[in-house]
């Protein structure tokens, strides 16, 4: 049962066929079934809130077990909150987010994990970013590496990395997509990971 609205229950249905499955959230009250509930006064879309809470729970487990080598840290101000950003160098929306990373750092520390959705070339860029960032000492140097590989004219791809590096980048992304993330950039405050 949901605490609000009173008397309404959320039900998570898992629909499977073969090796594919997806979850659907519905709401019930008595004999009635609703596909979503929206509270305009509180500005809450309950279905989306439940989805995000479920993803945060799964993401928390994966992130807490993540190797420090796979988390690129920008900012180190204990007074600022930290956000987790899952991103892809070939994603146009991720490029926009990365273009304003300095602005984001004014109010947040950022932990970045490369999670490409764009096939081998995207995973290759992830691997190249991790490799090159190991030598970066400052946030400015790390940001320069990101901007290099996020540039639309950067043609780095699968031919530029070993099979092992490519497979490691694929496995890293698969962990986070397996936790329920289905698009990038995916940004969440670390405090929300329970």
Model-derived segments and spans:
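Non-globular targeting/processing and membrane-anchoring segments
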Residues: 1-82, 125, 145-194
């Amino acid at each position: 049962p949901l605490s609000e609205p009173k008397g309404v229950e959320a039900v998570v249905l898992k629909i499977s066929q073969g090796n594919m499955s997806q979850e659907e959230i519905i709401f019930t009250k008595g004999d009635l079934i609703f596909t979503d509930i929206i509270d305009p006064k509180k500005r809450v879309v309950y279905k989306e809130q439940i989805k995000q809470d479920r993803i945060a729970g799964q993401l928390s487990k994966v992130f807490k077990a993540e190797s420090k080598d796979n988390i690129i840290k920008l900012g180190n101000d204990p007074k600022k909150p930290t956000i987790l950003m899952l991103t892809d160098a070939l994603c146009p929306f991720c490029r926009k987010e990365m273009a304003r990373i300095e602005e984001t750092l004014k109010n947040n520390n950022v932990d970045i994990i490369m999670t490409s959705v764009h096939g081998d070339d995207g995973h290759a860029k992830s691997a190249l970013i991790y490799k090159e960032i190991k030598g970066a000492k400052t946030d400015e140097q790390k940001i320069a590496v990101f901007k290099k590989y996020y540039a639309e004219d950067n043609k780095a791809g699968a031919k530029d990395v070993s099979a092992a590096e490519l497979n490691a980048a694929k496995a890293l992304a698969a962990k986070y997509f397996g936790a329920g993330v289905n698009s990038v950039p995916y940004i969440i405050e670390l405090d929300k990971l329970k």
